[in-house]
Amino acid sequence: MEDLQLDHLRFVYKSAVERWIAAIREEEDLATPDHSMVAVEAWDQAAFKEEAARGDAKAARKEYADALRKVLYNF
């Protein structure tokens, strides 16, 4: 695997982490003093989005780490 491919995997990973961070901040912003059903439902939806973004970041990390292990340790 060439450095260009590793750079791409690193970029994909870092982008996924940035989306995860944005989703965390969005969820945090929705934890407001507004205790209405609408506000709680929006907060719950943001939590689902955060969970999905976390999964994407973890998958991208695994792909990048696996590629690094293959290059560095031949497995």
PLM segments and residue spans:
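Short, charge/polar-rich alpha-helical segments
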Residues: 1-18, 47-49
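Basic/polar low-complexity intrinsically disordered segments
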Residues: 2-7, 52, 66-75
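Short E/K-rich amphipathic alpha-helical oligomerization segments
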Residues: 17-48
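Long amphipathic alpha-helical coiled-coil segments
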Residues: 32-41, 57-75
